[in-house]
Amino acid sequence: MSLEILDQLEEKIKQAVETIQLLQLEIDELKEKNNQSQQANDALRSENEQLKSEHQNWQERLRSLLGKIDNV
């Protein structure tokens, strides 16, 4: 009887270890996806700042041109 219980316990431990290993793999995959998402986010933020700067420069140039037209 006790041998049967030990076998059951061993099987449950093996299943628990397998589950833990699978969860660790999933965690590693999610960490990698998170890192990739963070890099993409950083790149998009940088691009957004660059585009805002370009937009502001264009607005200033347009204002300057409109000012010159008004002076004519």
UniProtKB/Swiss-Prot annotation:
Subunit relationships: Homodimer. The ends of the coiled-coil dimer bind to each other, forming polymers. Interacts with FtsZ.
Instruction: Check the UniProt entry and state the signal peptide residues, or none.
Output: none
Please provide the Gene Ontology terms (biological process) for this protein: division septum assembly; FtsZ-dependent cytokinesis
Report the subcellular localization.
Cytoplasm
Q: Which UniProt keywords apply?
A: Cell cycle, Cell division, Coiled coil, Cytoplasm, Septation
Protein's name in the database: Cell division protein ZapB
Q: Is Coiled coil tagged as a keyword?
A: yes
What organism is listed for this UniProt entry? Pasteurella multocida (strain Pm70)
Entry-linked HAMAP family: ZapB
- Gene that codes for this? zapB
Q: Coiled-coil regions in this chain?
A: 1-72
- Give GO cellular component annotations, separated by semicolons: cytoplasm
List, as start-end ranges, the regions of compositional bias called Basic and acidic residues. Answer: 44-57
Q: Which family does it belong to?
A: Belongs to the ZapB family.
Traced from the root, the source organism's taxonomic lineage reads: Bacteria, Pseudomonadati, Pseudomonadota, Gammaproteobacteria, Pasteurellales
Protein role = Non-essential, abundant cell division factor that is required for proper Z-ring formation. It is recruited early to the divisome by direct interaction with FtsZ, stimulating Z-ring assembly and thereby promoting cell division earlier in the cell cycle. Its recruitment to the Z-ring requires functional FtsA or ZipA.
Q: Where is this region: Disordered?
A: 33-57
- The intrachain disulfides are none
Query: Sorted alphabetically, which InterPro entries does this protein's record hold?
Result: Cell_div_ZapB
Domain of life, per lineage: Bacteria
